[in-house]
Amino acid sequence: MARIAGVDIPRDKRVVISLTYIFGIGRTTAQQILKEAGVSEDTRVRDLTEEELGKIRDVIDKLKVEGDLRREVSLNIKRLIEIGSYRGIRHRRGLPVRGQNTKNNARTRKGPRRTVANKKK
């Protein structure tokens, strides 16, 4: 397994797919990285030379990926919570942040249902 940005990427897959195992790199970014490094998208990771791996690593080092990106996202959310913005309040309460309806769905964000027992008359 090749190790890029602290992540073991699978050897048997195409490079373009393997790069998406790194947090912060999707298909489009992976294609741009390979274009800049001058590596074909169709090559398998096991067929890459050390030189090509080095070029890919150099390009990825310029991007914000893995731990740095996760830290930035969490700090952005903390900032929203601290300043008390609407989005911060929604984050704090564990509700959808982007204006979705919460009457029926939003179970992913709210978690499993908590049933309330009926009062006997």
Swiss-Prot record:
User: Would you say which domain of life the source belongs to?
Assistant: Bacteria
Q: Which Pfam families match?
A: Ribosomal_S13
Keyword Ribonucleoprotein assigned: yes
* Gene Ontology molecular function: any one: rRNA binding
Assigned keywords, A-Z? Ribonucleoprotein, Ribosomal protein, RNA-binding, rRNA-binding, tRNA-binding
- What PROSITE patterns does the annotation carry? RIBOSOMAL_S13_1 (PS00646), RIBOSOMAL_S13_2 (PS50159)
Composition skew (Basic residues), residue ranges: 106-121
What does the entry list under GO cellular component? cytosol; small ribosomal subunit
SUPFAM superfamilies to which the protein is assigned, alphabetical: S13-like H2TH domain
Could you give a single Gene Ontology term from the biological process aspect?
translation
Chain residue ranges for the region called Disordered: 93-121
Q: Give the matching NCBIfam families.
A: uS13_bact
Q: Quaternary form?
A: Part of the 30S ribosomal subunit. Forms a loose heterodimer with protein S19. Forms two bridges to the 50S subunit in the 70S ribosome.
The function of this protein is: Located at the top of the head of the 30S subunit, it contacts several helices of the 16S rRNA. In the 70S ribosome it contacts the 23S rRNA (bridge B1a) and protein L5 of the 50S subunit (bridge B1b), connecting the 2 subunits; these bridges are implicated in subunit movement. Contacts the tRNAs in the A and P-sites.
State the family it belongs to.
Belongs to the universal ribosomal protein uS13 family.
Official protein name in the record:
Small ribosomal subunit protein uS13
